[in-house]
Amino acid sequence: MEYEVTKDFDQITLKDDFMFFSVMSDKELCKELLERILDIKIKKLVYVAGQDTKKDSYDGKGVRLDIYTEDSENTVYNVEMQAGKSTNLPKRSRFYQSAIDLNQLHAGMDYDALKNTIVIFICTFDVFKKDFLKYTFKNICMEDKELVLNDATTKVFVNTTATLDDENLNPKLVSLIKYINSETITDEYTKKLDEAVRIKRRSADWRVKYMKYELNLLEREREGEKRLATLMDLLYKEHRFDDMGQVASDEEYRQKLYKEYNIQ
């Protein structure tokens, strides 16, 4: 089968999910990234794992490349680079949160055993169109906005397209964003990131992994096209023309109809 990758391995940067996944598997680089995004100090990361997940994605069919890590203060972090536009990120953050909780809580365990969790998406687009550099969400009471649920869950969406000239912004986060956007080195940390990226590019092993990853994406894209074609054919035969229009643009509704028609 002829195959051509979407981007040459020598050209991928930290904003590409595969390179981000590769570089952030390094505990110290991941630790400082989290510190810059969350504006906190982390004593120690005790566990870092890259999750090349193919069956536990939002729709059960896609590929996830995200980093799962825990610190010494009982907090779990899940961080992912999002370089392509997605209308499902808020619900995907809910899915990731649920998956983390299920992984932690075994039958018979007390809910107090659940750790603090922070789900982070670094997006090369503005999910919420407010030009904030960072959107942080916690569950609050709608009748009293100062009343926080304190369920120990946080979801963060970083917007790399935000205006960066606000003097109130965290300069370390701004430096990170500039590197993600254009590989501009402005401090010691971004220099380390750049060195790590270059090392990965020179690695024959990572080059092969990238080719396999891209091939996997292509195969899954073709599977998705076949499923969509099958669904469209069924909808056409049943004269569900309005549904045909909706599934073309609404992924959540498309997944619902896949289940309705049992299209695997």
Regions picked out by a protein language model, each given a short descriptive name:
Residues 1-154, 164-166, 251-253, 258, ...:
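Accessory alpha/beta interaction modules
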Residues 159-162, 168:
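Extended serine/threonine-enriched, polar tracts that run as long, contiguous segments within proteins
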